[in-house]
């Protein structure tokens, strides 16, 4: 999971 990641938020750019």
Swiss-Prot record:
Q: Does the keyword Secreted apply?
A: yes
Location of the protein in the cell: Secreted
In this chain, where does the modification Alanine amide occur? 4
Recorded superkingdom: Eukaryota
Q: List the keywords (alphabetical).
A: Amidation, Neuropeptide, Secreted
Q: Does the keyword Transit peptide apply?
A: no
One GO BP annotation is:
neuropeptide signaling pathway
Q: In which tissues is it expressed?
A: Neuron specific.
Q: What is this protein called?
A: Antho-KAamide
Source organism (scientific name): Anthopleura elegantissima (Green aggregating anemone)
